[in-house]
Regions:
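A glycine-/small-polar-enriched, mobile loop at the entrance of the PLP active site in fold-type I
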Residues: 2-60, 64
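Generic recognition of short, well-ordered alpha-helical segments
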Residues: 17, 95, 145-147
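Conserved beta-loop-alpha segment that forms the PLP phosphate-binding cup at the N-terminus of a helix
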Residues: 53-95
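Structural motif
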Residues: 84, 107, 135-136
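Active-site-proximal loop->helix
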Residues: 92-105, 118-119, 123
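Short beta->alpha junction loops
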Residues: 108-113
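Active-site phosphate-binding strand-loop segment of PLP-dependent enzymes
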Residues: 115-155
C-alpha cells in the first residue's frame, strides 16, 4: 500500500510508534478513576516544564476550542473586539466574543479574498478603540490564508 503525505488539517499522519500506542485499549476518561491521577500528574509536569506555579490545564477538543478559550480568557463584559471576518472561523469569533459578554465589531471581506492591508489601515484610522482583534491565519473552510506578517503589526 502506498502511503501519501496528508497535508490537511486532519487526519494527520503520525509516526509508527504513535500508531502502535493508539492501538492499545483505552478507557472512558470520564469514568476511569486512574485517569484523574494521570491527568493531574501530567498537568503538574507541564507546570514544572513551563516554570510556573499557576495551575495548568490541558484542553481536549477540536481546534476551535482554542479559539473559544482565547476569547474566554481575553473578553470581559462590554469589551469591543475587532473580529476579522473572511471565513467561517473568523466569523465564529463574533459568537464567542458575544458569549463572554463582549461586543464584536466585524471587519468583513468577501470569503474569496484575503484582507487588504491598506483598506484595514484606513479602517483603523477611523475606528481603533478595541481591546483586542481576532484574526484567523488560515480559515480552512474558505481556504483563505491571511498574511499575518502584514496584518498583525496594524492590530
Amino acid at each position: 500500500m502506498i502511503m501519501y503525505d496528508i497535508m490537511t488539517p486532519g487526519p494527520t499522519q503520525v509516526r509508527e510508534n504513535v500508531r502502535q500506542a493508539r492501538a492499545l485499549a483505552c478507557t472512558n476518561p470520564d469514568l476511569d478513576a486512574d485517569f484523574y491521577d494521570f491527568y493531574k500528574e501530567t498537568c503538574e509536569e507541564i507546570s514544572e516544564l513551563l516554570y510556573t506555579k499557576n495551575e495548568t490545564l490541558i484542553l481536549d477538543g477540536e481546534g476551535i476550542l482554542g479559539l473559544e478559550a482565547a476569547c474566554a480568557t481575553l473578553t470581559e463584559k462590554g469589551d469591543r473586539v475587532l473580529v476579522m471576518d473572511n471565513g467561517e472561523y473568523g466569523k465564529g469569533f463574533a459568537g464567542f466574543v458575544t458569549m463572554y459578554g463582549g461586543e464584536p465589531v466585524l471587519y468583513s471581506t468577501d470569503y474569496r479574498n484575503a484582507f487588504d492591508v491598506k483598506a484595514l489601515e484606513e479602517y483603523l484610522e477611523k475606528d481603533h478603540d478595541f481591546k483586542y482583534a481576532a484574526l484567523v491565519h488560515c480559515d480552512t473552510p474558505s481556504g483563505m490564508l491571511n498574511d499575518v506578517s502584514k496584518l498583525c503589526p496594524l492590530l
